Amino acid sequence: MKLAITGKGGVGKTTLASTLARLYADEGRTVLAADVDPDANLGLALGLSQEEVDAIVPISKMRTLVEERTGATDANRFYKLNPYVADIPEKYSKDINGVKLLVMGTVDVGGSGCVCPEHVMLKSILSALTYRKNDVVIMDMEAGLEHLGRGTASNMDQFIVVIEPGARSVQTYRNVKRLAKDLGVKQVRVVANKVRNESDEAFVRGAIPAEDLLGCIHYNPDIIDADRQGKSPYDFSPQAIDEIRQIKAILDREEN
């Protein structure tokens, strides 16, 4: 199972990504969670302490590693476009509650779409992750898909956009769907988070095609408490976990 979970900051995509990761890990699956968000907080959501998170150096910031694998240095402007990265998930991931966390970091490719060694490195790692045959791979990503090439995107089992019940959030889904289509992805799914009432749910169901909507997660103060304390939502909110478990059941049926 290969999942890319995206959405604007604050909508709850990391709550979904971390909870799915822990649900799969509890089943005994091998789970690798990749944090590809500039505001990296997947580690906290999985159960790491703030001190442990602060000690992690993102792959994109490991200059020596990037130079070693790509051949790029200050004196050498030429570098490999397909560096060897197959060993990186095992070497540089951190185990937490049965999940291997790989903090990727991000690279600002700029408006011109320029490519640097760090960007090539991240794209190569993401591509390699999609070929881990029997593993569950969950990518927690920002709303842009800059680090996904056509081959990587087409290997994903599910693209999931987390939204809130609002017009701007729905527009994010539409933007991601357009970008994903350009990469050869046939379907983009949606999870609506922070749904407070029937009116919110009706808005979501009116804005999102039924075949794209995986489900809703209702607004839950327990999730807010977990975030304030820097704890994993998995350990705080049985209601939210049950709702995400129902979403997982749909994903499992489609995997099989």
Descriptions of predicted regions:
Residues Y24, S93-K94, A128-R132, A153-S154, ...:
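Conserved catalytic network of the ASCE P-loop NTPase/AAA+ motor domain
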Residues L23-N97:
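N-terminal phosphate/diphosphate-binding loop that engages ATP/GTP or pyrophosphate donors
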Residues S124-K133, L148-A167:
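Inter-motif core of Ras-like GTPase G domains
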Residues M104-G110, C114-V115, L126-L148:
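Switch II (G3) loop of P-loop NTPases
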